Structure formats: structure tokens, C-alpha cells
A protein has these predicted regions:
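Serine residues within intrinsically disordered or low-complexity segments
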Residues: 3-4
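Phosphate/pyrophosphate- and phosphate-bearing ligand-binding catalytic cores of soluble enzymes
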Residues: 19-21, 27-33, 72, 168-274
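Solvent-exposed residues in well-ordered beta-strands and their adjoining turns
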Residues: 44, 87, 161, 199-203, ...
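Anion-binding (especially nucleotide phosphate/pyrophosphate-binding) glycine-rich loop
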Residues: 7-156, 162-164
Length: 276
């Protein structure tokens, strides 16, 4: 954090968390917009998260938790509360058995960096998530996906801080209610849980055969390819569509495909023909 800002500390038991005041939120959004946060802190652990929420609750201050800020557009007036940035790290292989590898990942890990790491060691299951901006915690919140893969397909469980009970809980995949770009954390109980970490299960060996025309065109007629090859193809396509948020402010692709009831399909098709 910027040491030039005035600061104080949140204290809970023997835990001491540094709090910054009047932090420019443009530095915490890939859109590079927004005013100041009245309070700002970075959480490196579950204890940090608990400390921050306890401090805020004692003072009646709202808390907004973020990852890398790729799914938020701040108001020009800023945020009149505590912005808590989740930077919890960790990448631990828990088990390897019968071609399946379970990995626990900290919520603050950058998603693309984790995907790169898993493909380097020959694992498959997340390579199509390459270059999606944000953290692994955010990917659970959003059920990030693309080119035939979603976080829900590899997720085993989520460790989270429950802001109501003030306890750390473990939620199995089914309890997360992951859907198309949706989850329990985003849609049903927004703000209740802070994702601390997640456990995923990946596979060894070649990547699954893709059916996406753009990827097939890049990969040729290979029936099987490595996860690294598929990652490279996905990156090439994404780079052709969107600029790097570090160079040009943007938040990636945030549009979702419409979900239609069966009776509405023919109407949609007739309307689409008008534009062909």
C-alpha cells in the first residue's frame, strides 16, 4: 500500500491490520476510474479478513471486498467505507492419484498466473480460462469461463469467511450454486462470504478435444493437444479481441449470452434474420 497516505490499525486479539485512508481507487480497478476509498486495507490471511470486518462492524462502517478490481467500476465520489483487497496467496498440491491432481489455491492468486502454472506442469482443465482478468477468488464469484471450460467443472470446495457468523466455513461445489456466470456469492447472498481459497481437481495428460471453430482453426486437425498448446491458442484469440488492461483500461469481456425459453427461440431467430 502507498505509505504516503495516513494510516491507522485495526486490532483484534493479537492481530494488527494496517488501514490506509483516502486511497485512490483508480489504482484498484482495471477501468482506472473512481474516487477515493475512505479506508483501505489488504488481507493476506483469513485472520486479516476477520480483523477487518470486526473493526468495521464496531464502527458501523460498510466493507467492500475486491480482488484485482476487474469487475468493478468505482463511483467518482469513491467509497465511503472500507475497501478490503484480498491478496491471499497459496498454491499447494494436496493429492495426486489416478491422473487427478487436487490443488488448493489462495483467493488472491491471479487467475491467469495459476492457469500458466498448471499448464507448465502438464495439467489440464483450466487452460481455456487463460487471460481472463482477475483473481481466483473472483473467478469463483463469477464462475468464470470460456471456450468450453468453466470454474465449476474443476471446483471441489471453497473456503470462505462468513460475515454473519464471523467464522471460516468450507462450502462444497454444490453449495456454491454455480451457474452461467453466477454463483451463491454473486446472486443469492452477495456480500455475505469472502472467498479465502478454493480447491480444484485437474487432470494429467492431453487437453480435451475442443469444438470451437476459432480454436480448431488455430490448432489444425490435431485430435489431441497439450494444455499448453490450447492455452497458447486461447491467448492468441483473446489478444486479438481485447487489449491488455495494464496498457488500455478495460475489464475484459463482460457480456453474457442470452438464455431463452424454448418458446422464445423462434421469435429470436425471426428477429435475427432482419439483421442478416
Amino acid at each position: 500500500m502507498d505509505s504516503s497516505n495516513s494510516h491507522s490499525y485495526a486490532v483484534k486479539g493479537d492481530k494488527r491490520l494496517q488501514l490506509e485512508q483516502d486511497v485512490d481507487l483508480r489504482d484498484h480497478s482495471t477501468m482506472r476510474v473512481g474516487g477515493p476509498a475512505k479506508w483501505f486495507a489488504e488481507a493476506n490471511s483469513a485472520a486479516d479478513v476477520e480483523c477487518a470486518y470486526a473493526w468495521a462492524a464496531e464502527r458501523g462502517i460498510p466493507v467492500y471486498t475486491i480482488g484485482s478490481g476487474s469487475n468493478v467500476i468505482w463511483s467518482d465520489t469513491g467509497y465511503a467505507g472500507l475497501v478490503l483487497k484480498n491478496i491471499i496467496r497459496g498454491f499447494q498440491i494436496l493429492s495426486e492419484q489416478d491422473g487427478q491432481v487436487a490443488i488448493r489455491i489462495g483467493a488472491g492468486e491471479i487467475l491467469d498466473e495459476v492457469v500458466a502454472r498448471t499448464t507448465r506442469i502438464g495439467l489440464t482443465g483450466m487452460e481455456c480460462l487463460s487471460l481472463i482478468p482477475g483473481t481466483c477468488g473472483g473467478s469463483v464469484y463469477q464462475n468464470s469461463g470460456g471456450y468450453g471450460q468453466e470454474v465449476s467443472q474443476v471446483l471441489q470446495s471453497v473456503d470462505a469467511f462468513d460475515t454473519i457468523s464471523c467464522k471460516v466455513v468450507v462450502l462444497e461445489t454444490e453449495a456454491c450454486n454455480l451457474g452461467y456466470r453466477s454463483s451463491r456469492f454473486k446472486n443469492e447472498e452477495p456480500g455475505r462470504y469472502v472467498v479465502l481459497g478454493l480447491t480444484v481437481k485437474l487432470q494429467t495428460g492431453p487437453a480435451n478435444r475442443t469444438t470451437y471453430p476459432a480454436l480448431l482453426a488455430m490448432l489444425g486437425d490435431r485430435s489431441r493437444c497439450s494444455s499448453a498448446d490450447l492455452r497458447a491458442a486461447v491467448i492468441s484469440i483473446r489478444e486479438s479481441k481485447l487489449p491488455d488492461p495494464a496498457l488500455v483500461p478495460n475489464c475484459g469481456s463482460f457480456f453474457t449470452n442470452p438464455i431463452l425459453r424454448a418458446r422464445d427461440v423462434n421469435v429470436a431467430l425471426r428477429l435475427s434474420l432482419i439483421h442478416i
